[in-house]
Amino acid sequence: MYSSPKKNEPKYITDFCPISLGNIVSRIISKVLANRIKCILPNVIFDSQSAFVPNRSIIDNITVAYEMLHRMRNRRKGKTWHMVVKLDISKAYDRVEWEFLQRIMLKIGILTQWVHLPMETVRTTSYSILINGEPTGFITPSRGIKQGDPLSPYLFLLCAEGLSPLIRKAIVNHHLKGVVSCNGGVKISHLLFANDSLLFCEATTRECKHLLDILALYEGASGQAINRHKTTLFFNPNTNQGVKLAIQNMLGVQIMTNCERYLGLPMVGEKSKVSTFREIQEWVTKRVIGWKEKHISKAGREVLIKTVIQAIPTYSMSMFKFSKKICDDIDLVLLQYWGGRLKMKEKSIESSHAS
């Protein structure tokens, strides 16, 4: 097991992410089981989850999430208030209870004989921690699934599926109401993508209490723990300020800021797209500044621009139409880098010939 730091200057144990380095045989077995289990996922995983499910895309979650947030952000009148809870799960893989995982697989209809196979790969795991590069002793875990294992994402997906029935049952019993996507549209109550979850409900202390009960039940059964330091809230503008504070105190979380992100993209955009995606240009500029100090050939600069720089905005552009100003600013940075290096090279060559 190797602990990879999440930050440049980690101070606490929570700032590290444990990465399991498995042997070849176990990875082959896990890969075979993963290829088998992913074939049945579209039939047993509800549409609210998109991660690792064949024929489902991350774009599905992003599209629905941004449409919902856009509608909520523009709702400034009315007596009904709504909110979005962006959940953050602490050490999601490491806290999975094996008994819960096994019962989930049996509940969704997987044969008992087949459930035994992935559970054996989980229960027969042992860890040896690398200290200064040397393996030291062995640890036999009693819960959790391995980071980096081919089968682990699918097992965690099944574990997260335990939250969906609780929310759907609350909707049926009118404990939660969800948020309507449009006039006459369907109600959206939750979107799950691995451990990135969005919960939609009315901004009332009553629904907040029911939501807390659901999360407490899920935490107790699955072993998962909500990280309240990173979990955030978003309210539509017409929500009463007193209600906001009451719900914030009940949940013990922070209200969402403009810099909050969902699946790698900003959740709450500015009025201008230029302001919202200004960080794209900043990322490009930082990369170029780092290369400027290095002696890179013309062919090397061309490869870096095409393979690295042009790939930076691709993910965001797949979802949003960038304004012409953003594209022009990025092009200007690249032209300055490209042209500036060429001029410096030409001057140095001319001076060397003159001498």
Give residue ranges: language-model regions:
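Nucleotidyl polymerases of mobile genetic elements and RNA viruses
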Residues: 1-355
